[in-house]
Amino acid sequence: MRALFLMMFIPFGALALGDGAWQGSGVGVMLDHRGVAASSQPLAPPQPVSGRMSLIAWTYVLDGPTPVGLTVKLCSQTNCTSIDGQSGTTRGLTNTDANEPLRFVWEVPGGGSMYPPLRVRSNQVIVNYTR
């Protein structure tokens, strides 16, 4: 009887210790001056999670052309990692607490105003984590 009980509940315990993921999305920012960084609103898990970040997928949508020299970083509260392109994956924040919010940070080097301004329509992350 005890063996049957253990056999029934071990699979559920194994699932509870497995990996997970959370998704966050938001509207973007407008950047109209070179040499000034702009940060998105924080993207956080909808409910508390426990684990360490592993693979993060991202996407963002711009209104208009991509300014020459645009740099984009994905940042936790303690670290940033550079990302290339409007979508992709990164392991640059591996081992960061999976409960930490993330932000996109955009910057175009130089000085002066930009025309047209950089408008970020939307941004999204999918954070995979291990427990």
Set out the residue ranges of the language-model regions.
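Sec-dependent signal peptide recognition
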Residues: 1-8
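N-terminal signal peptide c-region/cleavage motif recognized by signal peptidases
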Residues: 11-13
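Disulfide-rich extracellular domains of secreted proteins
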Residues: 16-131
